[in-house]
């Protein structure tokens, strides 16, 4: 069983108007992550947990501006939760692949110039699956020809 959790960093939500929606509740990223990931582990008992996080990694932040303080919390999430298998980050527009606190982290650049391919091999147990191995590979899309038909079909999205 695979569980996927989506998170957005505190710093990015300050400029949004989601609080105007009556069914939307905004709270601190780390608080929400701890509650929901604990709930998922206790109730759903996943074999594998992926977090998709619109925020970045402090270790690759080129600036340490005060206003970015709550934007790049991936390390904090990995360290304090410790049960995440893969965290996919976004925000800093740099390609990064690594491992911290037992969690694989990836971030795939910007403008679809690169992709990060994860290959995950599981080993079947009696009632569950166990991660046997995770490989990651950065794919440079500049090595591939553009699909002219697809470019025509998506032209309105690119304008």
Locate predicted features:
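Active-site nucleophile-His-acid catalytic modules used for acyl/amide transfer and hydrolysis
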Residues: 148-159
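Acidic, metal/ion-coordinating pockets
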Residues: 1-149
